[in-house]
Amino acid sequence: MKTSKTKTPKSVLIAGPCVIESLENLRSIAIKLQPLANNERLDFYFKASFDKANRTSLESYRGPGLGKGLEMLQTIKDEFGYKILTDVHESYQASAAAKVADILQIPAFLCRQTDLIVEVSQTNAIINIKKGQFMNPKDMQYSVLKALKTRDSSIQSPTYETALKNGVWLCERGSSFGYGNLVVDMRSLKIMREFAPVIFDATHSVQMPGGANGKSSGDSSFAPILARAAAAVGIDGLFAETHVDPKNALSDGANMLKPDELEHLVADMLKIQNLF
């Protein structure tokens, strides 16, 4: 998944369900991901959200909330030894989430929220900032700089090496293409990699926002295609949501891959990496 520019020793893999449905569901997915977590070429993180605060409909399932959600993620961390990623939507969540999570993620819709970025950057967690669907990839350097200057006030401009050293990553998840659709401009991977390590979110990139009568739809069959293309361009890691039963998932089921599908995809991406 990486080109020779990358200084990280392994390819990052971030995988898990969209939202915490139950502890039993988390365990069932975590077990299926063990072969990938044990792959020596991968730096693996288990992900899940304790709250999906930007669901289309008020009636949509959001998750167990901050307290119960973090307890369940801590259980997965203890039982499986996995490092954890979760996202935060409000500044007050950062310090509590950082006690459990190794990576705190800024959602795409909030990638310009200065107070949130600063609060997350004051923790010891890696910060993964998702590029907004509305953002010019070049302008993401300013979000990176907010985080970097919070961690080291002497930094004047963002570079790949400085962002890597200070644990500030970016994540590409597609750009708005008319109403209810996204497209991935692969040029953004190279552009953003000039000033930060870049993770490619293969499953949210195939989302169709708000395209299913009060909820988002998508087409997961395109996720492997985009992921392999991103690996060829050069990325630092892959983000992919996975579920043992995507059709019955409580959020983003149309975009998610089954664990065995993800395993095959990662194998392909590592082969592509060997070409560079």
Curated annotation (Swiss-Prot):
SUPFAM superfamilies: Aldolase. The keyword Transferase applies. It catalyses: D-arabinose 5-phosphate + phosphoenolpyruvate + H2O = 3-deoxy-alpha-D-manno-2-octulosonate-8-phosphate + phosphate. Keywords: Cytoplasm, Lipopolysaccharide biosynthesis, Transferase. Its EC number is 2.5.1.55. It comes from the Bacteria. The keyword Transferase applies. One of its GO terms (biological process) is keto-3-deoxy-D-manno-octulosonic acid biosynthetic process. One of its GO terms (molecular function) is 3-deoxy-8-phosphooctulonate synthase activity. Pathway: Carbohydrate biosynthesis; 3-deoxy-D-manno-octulosonate biosynthesis; 3-deoxy-D-manno-octulosonate from D-ribulose 5-phosphate: step 2/3; Bacterial outer membrane biogenesis; lipopolysaccharide biosynthesis. One of its GO terms (cellular component) is cytoplasm. PANTHER family: PHOSPHO-2-DEHYDRO-3-DEOXYHEPTONATE ALDOLASE. Disulfide bonds: none annotated. Belongs to the KdsA family. It is found in: Cytoplasm. This is 2-dehydro-3-deoxyphosphooctonate aldolase.
